[in-house]
């Protein structure tokens, strides 16, 4: 397992980011602390000079493992299940832009809040629109890989658990789509986290960590030892990305505490 830090472009509105703002500063922080990659949350890829980011990534020898898309929903109201056809089309077009960036770095594209909410519609109707949009994204992108992130009920009422995501994956039926599991959301929604991760198995393509209070891992009461033992058991050897509030003590301290906590867990697994 390799450790990554979630950072963002300066226009991010999402609070649960250890580092928000200048990408260079975020990437330099990640490298200095010891992270092996960064994950970048970005609202609109067209406003970032990705050639400069690529140069910086190579300069720091710091890969970009995933691209977050949720700001397109939070800031611009774009979603893959929006009842308005034109807005849904714009959401697909925006995510295609994210895939183009991801292709520059061999990164995953995260489908979190950009999938939207039910907004009074049935689960089945929302799911049908989502599957239609995901299949369209697969048609429009030749090599892009996506991960669907189950989110807790307070953020969305659509795809809250790993089982919800697995059911949709079976209907999409593509090895280019997997699951992103997040300890913060699982702590709210899953009945038995280790068993849920075992059901995800080889479809688990990415992993987010924050403690029970969404602070840095090590600052709450989440049982990381049990979860990391399960990750080892299912053969998970991909990235573990820290996506937490800049607490305690600000962005740098949160990044440092998280890294120390997780590194010790990984060492004990070997």
Swiss-Prot record:
<feature type="binding site">
    <location>
        <position position="182"/>
    </location>
    <ligand>
        <name>Mn(2+)</name>
    </ligand>
</feature>
<dbReference type="InterPro" id="IPR013022">
    <property type="entry name" value="Xyl_isomerase-like_TIM-brl"/>
</dbReference>
<protein>
    <recommendedName>
        <fullName>5-keto-L-gluconate epimerase</fullName>
        <ecNumber>5.1.3.-</ecNumber>
        <ecNumber>5.3.1.-</ecNumber>
    </recommendedName>
</protein>
<feature type="binding site">
    <location>
        <position position="155"/>
    </location>
    <ligand>
        <name>substrate</name>
    </ligand>
</feature>
<comment type="pathway">
    <text>Polyol metabolism; myo-inositol metabolism.</text>
</comment>
<feature type="binding site">
    <location>
        <position position="208"/>
    </location>
    <ligand>
        <name>Mn(2+)</name>
    </ligand>
</feature>
<keyword id="KW-0119">Carbohydrate metabolism</keyword>
<dbReference type="InterPro" id="IPR053560">
    <property type="entry name" value="Hyi_epimerase/isomerase"/>
</dbReference>
<dbReference type="InterPro" id="IPR036237">
    <property type="entry name" value="Xyl_isomerase-like_sf"/>
</dbReference>
<keyword id="KW-0479">Metal-binding</keyword>
<comment type="subunit">
    <text>Homodimer.</text>
</comment>
<keyword id="KW-0464">Manganese</keyword>
<feature type="binding site">
    <location>
        <position position="243"/>
    </location>
    <ligand>
        <name>Mn(2+)</name>
    </ligand>
</feature>
<feature type="binding site">
    <location>
        <position position="214"/>
    </location>
    <ligand>
        <name>substrate</name>
    </ligand>
</feature>
<feature type="active site" description="Proton donor/acceptor">
    <location>
        <position position="243"/>
    </location>
</feature>
<dbReference type="GO" id="GO:0046872">
    <property type="term" value="F:metal ion binding"/>
</dbReference>
<comment type="function">
    <text>Catalyzes the reversible epimerization between 5-keto-L-gluconate (5-dehydro-L-gluconate) and D-tagaturonate, and thus probably functions in a myo-inositol degradation pathway together with IolG, IolM and IolN. Is not active on the enantiomer 5-keto-D-gluconate. Was also shown to be a nonphosphorylated sugar isomerase with broad substrate specificity in vitro. Is able to catalyze the reversible C3-epimerization of L-ribulose to L-xylulose, D-ribulose to D-xylulose, D-psicose to D-fructose, and D-tagatose to D-sorbose, with a substrate preference for ketopentoses rather than ketohexoses.</text>
</comment>
<feature type="active site" description="Proton donor/acceptor">
    <location>
        <position position="149"/>
    </location>
</feature>
<comment type="similarity">
    <text>Belongs to the hyi family.</text>
</comment>
<dbReference type="GO" id="GO:0006020">
    <property type="term" value="P:inositol metabolic process"/>
</dbReference>
<dbReference type="Pfam" id="PF01261">
    <property type="entry name" value="AP_endonuc_2"/>
</dbReference>
<dbReference type="InterPro" id="IPR050417">
    <property type="entry name" value="Sugar_Epim/Isomerase"/>
</dbReference>
<dbReference type="GO" id="GO:0016853">
    <property type="term" value="F:isomerase activity"/>
</dbReference>
<feature type="binding site">
    <location>
        <position position="149"/>
    </location>
    <ligand>
        <name>Mn(2+)</name>
    </ligand>
</feature>
<feature type="binding site">
    <location>
        <position position="185"/>
    </location>
    <ligand>
        <name>substrate</name>
    </ligand>
</feature>
<keyword id="KW-0413">Isomerase</keyword>
């Amino acid at each position: 397992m390799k450790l990554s830090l979630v950072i963002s472009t300066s226009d991010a509105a999402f609070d649960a980011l250890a580092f928000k703002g200048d990408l260079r500063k975020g990437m330099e922080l990640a490298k200095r602390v010891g992270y092996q990659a960064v994950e970048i949350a970005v609202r609109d890829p067209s406003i970032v000079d990705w050639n400069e980011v690529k140069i910086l990534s190579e300069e720091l020898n710091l890969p970009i493992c995933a691209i977050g898309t949720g700001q397109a929903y939070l800031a611009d109201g774009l979603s893959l299940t929006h009842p308005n056809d034109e807005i849904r089309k714009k959401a697909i077009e925006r995510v295609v832009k994210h895939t183009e960036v991801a292709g520059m770095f061999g990164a995953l594209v995260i489908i979190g809040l950009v999938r939207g909410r039910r907004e009074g519609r049935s689960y089945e109707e929302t799911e049908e629109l989502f599957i239609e949009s995901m299949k369209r994204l697969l048609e429009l992108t030749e090599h892009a890989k996506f991960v669907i992130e189950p989110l807790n009920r307070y953020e969305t009422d659509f795809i809250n658990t790993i089982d919800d995501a697995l059911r949709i994956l079976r209907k999409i039926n593509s090895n280019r789509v997997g699951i992103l599991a997040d300890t913060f959301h699982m702590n709210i929604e899953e009945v038995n986290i280790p068993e849920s991760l075992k059901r995800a198995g080889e479809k688990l393509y990415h992993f987010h960590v924050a403690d029970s209070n969404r602070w840095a891992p090590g600052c709450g009461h989440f049982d990381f030892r049990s979860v990391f033992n399960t990750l080892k058991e299912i053969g998970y050897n991909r990235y573990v990305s820290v996506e937490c509030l800049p607490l305690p003590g600000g962005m740098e301290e949160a990044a440092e505490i998280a890294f120390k906590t997780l590194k010790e867990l990984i060492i004990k697994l070997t």
